[in-house]
Amino acid sequence: MNGTAVIQMLLNGSFTMIHERLDEMTDEEWSERALPGTSQLGFILWHCSRIIDWTVQCALQGVPELADRPEWRARFLQEACYGAGIPDAVADRVVASTNRTEVALYLGEVKAAVGEWFAHQTDQTLDAVPPMKANQAGRPGYLDPAVWAEVEDLNGLPMWQVLVRPCGAHIRRHMGEYDVLLGALRAGAVTPRA
């Protein structure tokens, strides 16, 4: 066993969990909010998809994200960045601007790109410390205080730690959140947002 194999398994699990939830939810559930003060269900899955793209492309490599491609720029609000540290109203507009089918297609493209990049990684390359803050500098909104505060603690860490936190632990936290909220919604515990 090696560390790279463990991280590959973690990444594959993250993609699978997000895809399963996108496939299993209904179009109506996409824009539902189960409880006051929580995100709409679609936003959680969009954010999880975006955070993986951001982590591998922008944070680690300093290259354009797949969300920067014309077909995704037209569908995803640029002011939403990758979904961290943004106002609730912007998060709600993200959900209104896209749908679960589009996000599933995007996630499939992200998975392919991440797989291609990861195939060239070794335990040694993943020990490198990326210039994460510098990689954000050319991106509108990415260094805004509220957005940067959400990821600042990753700056200065080796690539493997940056990968396992947003693309592993963070995804699993949001999957638990999503599952609880979807369960509440399906049980009829929906309440209007306060």
Spans of features found by a protein language model:
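Amphipathic alpha-helical packing segments from all-alpha helical-bundle domains
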Residues: I18-R21, V110
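Vicinal oxygen chelate
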Residues: L107, A112-V114, D123
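Phosphate/pyrophosphate-binding loop motifs in nucleotide- or prenyl diphosphate-using proteins
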Residues: G85, A89-R93
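Short, contiguous, well-structured surface segments enriched in hydrophobic/aromatic residues
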Residues: E24-M25
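N-terminal export signals and maturation junctions of secreted/periplasmic proteins
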Residues: M1-M9
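A Lys/Arg-rich helix-loop hairpin that forms a DNA/phosphate-binding surface
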Residues: L126-D127
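Short, contiguous alpha-helical
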Residues: Q8-N12, W30-G85, A112-G115, A119, ...
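A short, structured beta-strand-centered segment in the mid-to-C-terminal lobe
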Residues: R93-Y106
